[in-house]
A protein has these predicted regions:
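Glycine-biased, small-residue-rich flexible motifs in mid-sequence functional cores and linkers
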Residues: 2-7, 92-298
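Short, positively charged patches
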Residues: 1-138
Length: 298
């Protein structure tokens, strides 16, 4: 990569450095803005400045010094491939970055978007259910999803976890647009050609993901796989990104309860289904935290 790095390439280059996570990447970009340094100027800085001012960890510093040429080439290849496939990535400093995410306890420093970006501008809703959601809960969720889609709302879904999967199937089956939040990188979810439908059961209705009709969003590096912490972070991202959250079935004292309390403290819109309140203490906890009761129309 002989020519100067563009802002887009620089962001990708930093994202791929070892041990550069959300907090470090955010700090690097903020310091760069304050110091008004170009990528080329930063790469010429001594290790001491990169360590103290930019807080780059040891492995990242070593990669800059010993693997720079290879990493610049890797960045160029990945930039060309993702761009050719229609992937867009943006930092928290980008005007198109969803402002709602800045309220997250640890917001993504970078987001990778693949598909119809305009879906984020419309009315979005997330239907939440615990990992152990009951068959009755899934049936209620499906009925609610169909009703909301009929009203023109866009579902926020995921390809893993039963409640999200059921909502995803509803959207695909009805040909409705949806926003797919991932718990791994885009290339890991869709394959290198970014065509594979990541949820096997959805392939009955669509063999390949349709970027014209849906939007996939990932806060993870393109080739990152699933980690134990990825699911909770994905849930948090969905909760903050959604225009409204409707809790179908929550486990008492579980993560959904914790997330909804957090959302309510930030003044976000949280509804909780109440028709089985006597059997769902988790839903009751969310209601007691200040959520709005929600009973689907017959």
């Amino acid at each position: 990569m002989a020519s100067p790095l563009t802002d887009r390439q620089w962001l990708l280059f930093l994202t791929l450095l070892p041990d550069v996570g959300r907090k470090t990447l955010r700090h690097v970009l903020e310091r760069q803005q304050v110091r008004r340094e170009t990528p080329a100027e930063i790469l010429r800085l001594p290790d001491e400045t990169l360590r103290e001012e930019y807080r780059l960890p040891p492995r990242a510093l070593r990669a800059l010094r010993e693997e720079r040429a290879a990493r610049l080439e890797e960045t160029a290849r990945l930039d060309a491939h993702l761009t050719r496939c229609g992937v867009r990535w943006l930092s928290f400093q980008d005007a198109a970055y969803p402002a709602a995410l800045e309220a997250m306890p640890e917001p993504p420093a970078v987001l990778f978007l693949y598909g119809n970006h305009a879906l984020l501008d419309g009315l979005t809703v997330a239907l939440l259910g615990s990992h152990a959601i009951s068959a009755e809960g899934l049936q209620e969720l499906e009925q609610l999803a169909e009703s909301l889609m009929a009203q023109g709302l866009t579902l926020l879904v995921s390809a893993t976890q039963p409640a999200y999967q059921r909502a995803l199937l509803c959207a695909v089956r009805h040909g409705a647009p949806y926003v797919l939040a991932l718990d791994r990188g885009l290339l890991r979810a869709f394959g290198d050609d970014l065509r594979k439908e990541p949820f096997k059961q959805a392939r009955v209705w669509q063999a390949e993901f349709d970027p014209a009709h849906a939007l996939a969003i990932s806060p993870f590096r393109p080739r990152d796989g699933w980690l134990a912490s990825s699911g909770k972070y994905r849930d948090t991202l969905i909760g903050y990104l959604a225009g409204a959250v409707i809790v179908v079935e929550a486990r008492p004292d579980g993560y959904i309860v914790q997330l909804c309390r957090e959302l309510l403290q930030h003044g976000r819109t949280v509804y909780v289904m109440t028709q089985r309140l006597d059997r769902l203490p988790g839903n009751r906890q969310i209601l007691e935290a200040g959520a709005t009761p929600f009973t689907p129309q017959a």
